[in-house]
């Protein structure tokens, strides 16, 4: 804008958009600090402005040591950003895991043309949300297998230091409204997403997370997931329907095969 251009000229930073951005951030930070308020924002506020845009991984030290809270969101599998929250936490920043590949309710779970939502962060199903290990994202063997993540990729990623676990203060789900055209679609995106997310956010870690042997961990994961999804399908959804009624649910279509003249079908819940 002409105002920004004049400001940059007056402050001898013509063409340096990172400097302009940091000046703006400083004004916001100082204003909030004067009210004893904590500055919060998407983790983009700590990333350098480059042509990579939202795929950038270079962290500025501009706010190093300052009291800010980062919501770390863009972590599509294989995109080089799964470990960003650990990088921030290891640098001392307080963070909230807001993963687009698991905690965005508007992400569709497959290529079904009847789905309403987006897929720019991959296809995220309910198991993707449930299997997130907040403190070790690659401990999730389901997500690793589903997205063909290599051993080399995992080994090159930053790990969270045990001394910095307290810098991850929680998780957060998001729902964006670009494709929400009516109340039914809103219900559809919330249910049963909010049930699965609440289990992840408020319950203690499932047993599979602490199983050291990889094969045994996968067996335990599948067993616990099967138990949880049956609880949703047989108890939780019928209870909610009985109490509230009239809600729209996102229930993925069943898969089926015909074998020996019999139909075999499966369902998500």
Q: What is each model feature region?
A:
Residues 82-174:
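Aromatic-lined glycan-binding groove of carbohydrate-active enzymes
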